[in-house]
């Protein structure tokens, strides 16, 4: 206070003011500070005093021809004096105003194309809705977020090649445009930017914004998709938040969201198949998201989510080194441990074999709605500091940490038997057994954990076994904090391996991910996901399985027909018939299969009983392991639309309806495709069925005697040739194969050769 008073007194004297405003600064140190180096030391001040001058701007001499010396008000726009040290002209700020109003205009057609991301942002903000402001403590945690809405997902190198090709097509330098997205974007941009007058460097910079994902590590409470991050400064402060609904969506957020849904569906489906890893890869390779191959998206998209990372690991891509447990991402921040197998007894005296982590370790735990810091020793929780959005989220984090600690009191808190199974009906591993048990009900766990008195520490409070806050007592070692725990910021990726049950391990053998960690949350994808794999037919329910199965048979009828006559077992084992089995009542599967297989065998043996439509209709039923029985059926039941519906063995039904006139099949009223059969439908199938073991050599050859009927063929010796009468009175030359085993590829040509021989 004294000093301020003294200064006030000084300033009231006119001499002081004169010294401060008029005296030159001639102290060498000060002059040095402000004049050494090219870097401006006080840009704001410099700008202020420059703009106070009459001519603060320099311009090329050509400006004198383009701008009048004075404006309409008679103010001078440029000075005839040269800028010291260059041959440029000194110009007034008023010249800029004149130029903006009266200067030359250019075509603006390219602006929305080049500055696309800005124009789109304006649209999103225009149509967005801002809600009320709430004042409350904000638990923000730093997360790696996408700050650039509306981008493609090219790598920096790929984008660089595209930009060079679009903006500087004549520059020297090897550019290899390989990926589909690179080629599409290049073509599109070249067309859009023809005759563009905007500075190439600006175009290049804007293209980069459009092509590459930019991420930052920012404190966020709430939505993390890029359309929320672009308004982060408007929606959350230190003690307030403003509700906001974006006025539009962007492709990159939609891709991220749809990728997660597709990956979860695929992992869930793969888990229940005979070879999960092979199935997962088959599905990833045959799935498209928004018209782009899922494997291409996986290679480029940095989204970290359990199911997505399992798919990446299966493709041999690197993933983050953090591991997942109970839906939380764990990252070890210090300490180390060795793993030992140990047998423990639950409160129900059930023996569990668990892999115990021996040693002191510290972890950060990050989930969607809660975060925590965990310090633990061998089978002991030392400290857990947790923060979350609400009581429920905090409880979830505490349960996961307690189970992860492997403490004895947690294992003893188990009541009843642990027999949780996964989707494939296999028992879960012991740690996940415990987790599921306590996620269902953690009362006993919290009650038997123990409580302790707590010190008063700023920003921390205790939490009681019933999950209510307290300032006096808390669950042993557990505290609730107002501050969130930041997500692990590193973008480092490590090489991992994956086994056939989709367990992902790092190079030390630690399990980072397993299908148990994949969220069961269902969502609706923003982009169309097209699963071409038969394994995904059931995702849309029983009807979809039925329609897809029959569509598949019709699409592949040529091959199916030959296999049906030559190698039925191989046909019955096709994975495309797997989903169908879930529609057939369990008790009837074997009987139906036995019945249909017998029927098919009769068709193969007895001439003229071949019936294309009937084979198509009954084929899926033959895929189950058959039971030998004498049972006959006039209709077969399938479970769709919540009840059993009948497929008639002979004739049409609402489930399976074949229209002879249009040759189209409808399944449950949905079109399942058209049969492309020969005009004499049925006979071509018979020929290839009956001519099994014979090679069709061509047209009739009189040297081999008169035409035999198909029935007389059986008398030929191996290697012997004969003319044979088929179908509508046509004659072809055949030879009996020298080997008994009929080869599939030979017979695939049978039908074609009959046609060629006849024509």
Swiss-Prot record:
<comment type="subunit">
    <text>Influenza RNA polymerase is composed of three subunits: PB1, PB2 and PA. Interacts (via N-terminus) with PB1 (via C-terminus). Interacts with nucleoprotein NP (via N-terminus).</text>
</comment>
<dbReference type="InterPro" id="IPR049106">
    <property type="entry name" value="Flu_PB2_N"/>
</dbReference>
<dbReference type="Pfam" id="PF20948">
    <property type="entry name" value="Flu_PB2_2nd"/>
</dbReference>
<keyword id="KW-1190">Host gene expression shutoff by virus</keyword>
<dbReference type="GO" id="GO:0042025">
    <property type="term" value="C:host cell nucleus"/>
</dbReference>
<keyword id="KW-0507">mRNA processing</keyword>
<dbReference type="Pfam" id="PF20951">
    <property type="entry name" value="Flu_PB2_6th"/>
</dbReference>
<dbReference type="InterPro" id="IPR048298">
    <property type="entry name" value="Flu_PB2_CAP-bd"/>
</dbReference>
<dbReference type="GO" id="GO:0044423">
    <property type="term" value="C:virion component"/>
</dbReference>
<keyword id="KW-0946">Virion</keyword>
<dbReference type="Pfam" id="PF00604">
    <property type="entry name" value="Flu_PB2_5th"/>
</dbReference>
<dbReference type="InterPro" id="IPR049115">
    <property type="entry name" value="Flu_PB2_C"/>
</dbReference>
<dbReference type="InterPro" id="IPR049113">
    <property type="entry name" value="PB2_helical"/>
</dbReference>
<dbReference type="GO" id="GO:0075526">
    <property type="term" value="P:cap snatching"/>
</dbReference>
<protein>
    <recommendedName>
        <fullName>Polymerase basic protein 2</fullName>
    </recommendedName>
</protein>
<dbReference type="GO" id="GO:0003723">
    <property type="term" value="F:RNA binding"/>
</dbReference>
<dbReference type="GO" id="GO:0039694">
    <property type="term" value="P:viral RNA genome replication"/>
</dbReference>
<dbReference type="InterPro" id="IPR001591">
    <property type="entry name" value="INV_PB2"/>
</dbReference>
<dbReference type="GO" id="GO:0039657">
    <property type="term" value="P:symbiont-mediated suppression of host gene expression"/>
</dbReference>
<dbReference type="Pfam" id="PF20950">
    <property type="entry name" value="Flu_PB2_4th"/>
</dbReference>
<dbReference type="Pfam" id="PF20947">
    <property type="entry name" value="Flu_PB2_1st"/>
</dbReference>
<dbReference type="Pfam" id="PF20949">
    <property type="entry name" value="Flu_PB2_3rd"/>
</dbReference>
<keyword id="KW-1195">Viral transcription</keyword>
<dbReference type="GO" id="GO:0003968">
    <property type="term" value="F:RNA-directed RNA polymerase activity"/>
</dbReference>
<dbReference type="InterPro" id="IPR049111">
    <property type="entry name" value="Flu_PB2_middle"/>
</dbReference>
<keyword id="KW-0506">mRNA capping</keyword>
<feature type="short sequence motif" description="Nuclear localization signal">
    <location>
        <begin position="736"/>
        <end position="739"/>
    </location>
</feature>
<comment type="function">
    <text>Plays an essential role in transcription initiation and cap-stealing mechanism, in which cellular capped pre-mRNAs are used to generate primers for viral transcription. Recognizes and binds the 7-methylguanosine-containing cap of the target pre-RNA which is subsequently cleaved after 10-13 nucleotides by the viral protein PA. Plays a role in the initiation of the viral genome replication and modulates the activity of the ribonucleoprotein (RNP) complex.</text>
</comment>
<dbReference type="GO" id="GO:0006351">
    <property type="term" value="P:DNA-templated transcription"/>
</dbReference>
<keyword id="KW-1191">Eukaryotic host transcription shutoff by virus</keyword>
<dbReference type="InterPro" id="IPR049114">
    <property type="entry name" value="Flu_PB2_6th"/>
</dbReference>
<keyword id="KW-0945">Host-virus interaction</keyword>
<keyword id="KW-1157">Cap snatching</keyword>
<keyword id="KW-1262">Eukaryotic host gene expression shutoff by virus</keyword>
<dbReference type="Pfam" id="PF20952">
    <property type="entry name" value="Flu_PB2_7th"/>
</dbReference>
<keyword id="KW-1048">Host nucleus</keyword>
<dbReference type="InterPro" id="IPR049110">
    <property type="entry name" value="Flu_PB2_2nd"/>
</dbReference>
<dbReference type="GO" id="GO:0006370">
    <property type="term" value="P:7-methylguanosine mRNA capping"/>
</dbReference>
<feature type="site" description="Avian adaptation">
    <location>
        <position position="627"/>
    </location>
</feature>
<keyword id="KW-1104">Inhibition of host RNA polymerase II by virus</keyword>
<dbReference type="InterPro" id="IPR037258">
    <property type="entry name" value="PDB2_C"/>
</dbReference>
<dbReference type="GO" id="GO:0039523">
    <property type="term" value="P:symbiont-mediated suppression of host mRNA transcription via inhibition of RNA polymerase II activity"/>
</dbReference>
């Amino acid at each position: 206070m004294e000093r301020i008073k003294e200064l006030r007194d000084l300033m009231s004297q006119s001499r002081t003011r004169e010294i401060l405003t008029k005296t030159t600064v001639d102290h060498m140190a000060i002059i040095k500070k402000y004049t050494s180096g090219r870097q401006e030391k006080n840009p704001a001040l410099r700008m202020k005093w420059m703009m106070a001058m009459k001519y603060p701007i320099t311009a090329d001499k050509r400006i004198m021809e383009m701008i009048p010396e004075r404006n309409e008000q008679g103010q001078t726009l440029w000075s005839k004096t040269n800028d010291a040290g260059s041959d440029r002209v000194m110009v007034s700020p008023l010249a800029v105003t004149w130029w903006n109003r009266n200067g030359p205009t250019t075509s603006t057609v390219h602006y929305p194309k080049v500055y696309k991301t800005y124009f789109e942002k304006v649209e999103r903000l225009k149509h967005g809705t801002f809600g009320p402001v709430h004042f409350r403590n904000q638990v923000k945690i730093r997360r790696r977020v996408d700050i650039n809405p509306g981008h493609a997902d090219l790598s920096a190198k790929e984008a660089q090649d595209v930009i060079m090709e679009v903006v500087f097509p004549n520059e020297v330098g090897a550019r290899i445009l390989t990926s589909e997205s690179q080629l599409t974007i290049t073509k599109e941009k070249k067309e859009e930017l023809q005759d563009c007058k905007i500075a190439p460097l600006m175009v290049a910079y804007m293209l980069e914004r459009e092509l590459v994902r930019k991420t930052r590590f920012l404190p966020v409470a709430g939505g993390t998709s890029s359309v929320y991050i672009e308004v982060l400064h408007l929606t959350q402060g230190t003690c307030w938040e403003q509700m906001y609904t974006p006025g539009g969506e962007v492709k990159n957020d939609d891709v991220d969201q749809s990728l997660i849904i597709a990956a979860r569906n695929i992992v869930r489906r793969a888990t229940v198949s005979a070879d999960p890893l092979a199935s997962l890869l088959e599905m990833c390779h045959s799935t498209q998201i928004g018209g782009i191959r899922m494997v291409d998206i996986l290679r480029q998209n940095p989204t970290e989510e359990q199911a997505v990372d399992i798919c990446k690991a299966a493709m041999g891509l690197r993933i983050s080194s953090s591991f997942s447990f109970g839906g939380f991402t764990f990252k070890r921040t210090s300490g180390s441990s060795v793993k030992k197998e140990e047998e423990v007894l639950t409160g129900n005296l059930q023996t569990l074999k668990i892999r115990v982590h021996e040693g002191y370790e510290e972890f950060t735990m990050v989930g969607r709605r809660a975060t925590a810091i965990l310090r633990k020793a061998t089978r002991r929780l030392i400290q857990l500091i947790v923060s979350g959005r609400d009581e429920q989220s905090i409880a979830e984090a505490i349960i996961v940490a307690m189970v992860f600690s492997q403490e004895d009191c947690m294992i003893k808190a188990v009541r009843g038997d642990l027999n949780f199974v996964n989707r494939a009906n296999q028992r879960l591993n012991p740690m996940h057994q415990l987790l599921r048990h306590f996620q269902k009900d953690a009362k006993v766990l919290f009650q038997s954990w123990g409580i302790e008195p707590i010190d008063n520490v700023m920003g921390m409070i205790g939490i009681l076994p019933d999950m209510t806050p307290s300032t006096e007592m808390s669950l042993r070692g557990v505290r609730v904090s107002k501050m969130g725990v930041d997500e692990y910021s590193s973008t480092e990726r490590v090489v991992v391996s994956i086994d056939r049950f989709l367990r992902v391990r790092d190079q030390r053998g630690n399990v980072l991910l397993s299908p148990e960690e994949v969220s069961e949350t269902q969502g609706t994808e923003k982009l169309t996901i097209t699963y071409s794999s038969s394994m995904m037919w059931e995702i849309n329910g029983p009807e979809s399985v039925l329609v897809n199965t029959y569509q598949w048979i019709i699409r592949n009828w040529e091959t199916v027909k030959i296999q049906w006559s030559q190698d039925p077992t191989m046909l019955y084992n096709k994975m495309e018939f797997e989903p169908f089995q879930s529609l057939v009542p369990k008790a009837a599967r074997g009987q139906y299969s036995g019945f249909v297989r017998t029927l098919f065998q009769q068709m193969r043996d007895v001439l003229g009983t071949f019936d294309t439509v009937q084979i198509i209709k009954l084929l899926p039923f033959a895929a189950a392991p058959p039971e030998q029985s004498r049972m006959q059926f006039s209709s077969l039941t399938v479970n769709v639309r919540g009840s059993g519906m009948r497929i008639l063995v002979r004739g049409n039904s609402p489930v399976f309806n074949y229209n002879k006139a249009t040759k189209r099949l409808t399944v449950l009223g949905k079109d399942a495709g058209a049969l492309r059969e020969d005009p004499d439908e049925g006979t071509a199938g018979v020929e290839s069925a009956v001519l099994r073991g014979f090679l069709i050599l061509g047209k009739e050859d009189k040297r081999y005697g008169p035409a035999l009927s198909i029935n007389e063929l059986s008398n030929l010796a191996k290697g012997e040739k004969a003319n044979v009468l088929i179908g509508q009175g046509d004659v072809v030359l055949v030879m009996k194969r020298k080997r008994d085993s009929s080869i599939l590829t030979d017979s695939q040509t049978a039908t074609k050769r009959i046609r060629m021989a006849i024509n």
